[in-house]
Regions:
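A generic local structural motif
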Residues: 4-6, 24-27, 48-52, 68-70, ...
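Conserved beta-strand hairpin/beta-sheet module of binuclear metal-dependent hydrolase folds
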Residues: 4-55, 186-201
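Active-site HxH/HxHxD metal-binding segment of metal-dependent hydrolases
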Residues: 48-163, 202, 251-262
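Structural signal for conserved beta-strand scaffold positions within catalytic alpha/beta enzyme cores
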Residues: 12, 19, 65, 83-86, ...
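Accessory terminal helices/loops
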Residues: 1-2, 98, 135-139, 203, ...
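Metallo-beta-lactamase
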Residues: 37, 44-46, 146-149, 156, ...
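Generic recognition of long tandem-repeat/solenoid scaffolds
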Residues: 17-20, 94-95, 99-101, 280
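Short Pro/Gly-enriched beta-strand edge/turn motifs at strand-loop
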Residues: 10-15, 141-147, 167-169
Length: 291
């Protein structure tokens, strides 16, 4: 089932697992057990994410931020219970510098200007887009000049190996530093699902930011790749292809191994803020590293 009448699009991808997306800005995921639910990331702080979630479950909801970045924690203020890896707590409580988000606002405007042409081309020739992957206008009355993402205070700090019990379903915390020092993935071993945050993406994976660490990224992805045989789906936080099969874990690990070995080819590129970076292209993803 999809629901796309608002800024958020939702789809139940697996039993008890819903995509809650602001396409293509960010993909959040709601995971429900018998007793409680977990919302993995809260998006940009635009639109009513709590309303989107309460339309899917009446269970108590714990927010888990996969890392401190504003595009994963922007909607935290709509919820009471928030958790993050302990290394991200201070940055989460500091909140973002909104002035530094102005390039993203410009990027978003450019994207919306081009959506109509892209969608028409897609409908005529390709059929890639679906409701939950099609960019949509910002909510009525939204103005970037008034956009604010308040700091948030976590109620629980996470560490590697912690188990979150939802009642009949558990999620295990995997600390996967690389994108940021506090980055985590969440593993549903029983159902073979891995929620990758920004450790995995189907577009460029960001390994070029000031607190990114390419070698740590390689170690993290190599570790998670050891679990690939038990993973059916990998859920990613950005871009329209929000779910990949488990072998994607092996591909990403191999890509980072190639990069740290000095064997990857790069081209000059930019990120969505217009920042300079170098891009290594692989079959189903890319990796941005610092110039």
């Amino acid at each position: 089932m999809t629901a796309g009448s608002s800024w958020f699009a939702t789809r139940e991808h697996q039993p008890g697992v819903w995509l809650v997306a602001a396409p293509p800005h960010v993909n959040c995921f709601l995971v429900a057990g018998r007793e409680r639910a977990i919302l993995i990331d809260t998006g940009l702080g635009i639109g009513d994410i709590r309303g989107a979630v309460t339309g899917l479950t009446d269970l108590d909801v714990l927010v888990v931020n996969t890392h401190y970045h504003w595009d994963h924690s922007g909607g935290n203020g709509a919820f009471d219970d928030i958790s993050i890896h302990e290394l991200g707590a201070e940055r989460l409580q500091r909140g973002p510098d909104m002035a530094k988000l102005e390039p993203y606002a410009a990027y978003s405007r450019r994207m919306l200007e081009r959506v109509a042409e892209f969608r028409a081309t897609d409908e005529e020739f390709f059929g890639f887009l679906s409701d939950e992957t099609t960019p949509r206008p910002f909510p009525d009355g939204f103005d970037f000049a008034d956009w604010k993402i308040p700091a948030s205070v976590p109620t629980r700090l996470l560490n590697d190996g912690d188990v979150l019990d939802l009642g009949g379903r558990t999620l295990r915390v995997l600390h996967t530093p690389g994108h940021t020092p506090d980055s985590i993935c969440l593993l549903d071993e029983q159902n073979g699902l891995l929620f990758g945050g920004d450790t995995y993406n189907t577009g460029p994976i960001y390994a070029h930011l000031p607190d990114s660490d390419v070698e740590a990224f390689a170690r993290s992805t190599a570790r998670v790749a050891e679990l690939a045989d038990g993973v059916a789906f990998v859920y990613v936080a950005h871009f329209s292809r929000y779910a990949e099969i488990g072998t994607f874990l092996n591909e990403v690990a191999a890509g980072f191994a190639e990069i740290v070995a000095g064997e990857a080819s790069f081209e000059e590129s930019r990120d969505d803020d217009g920042g300079d970076a170098r891009l290594a292209r692989f079959a189903r993803f890319g990796v941005l590293v610092a110039s």
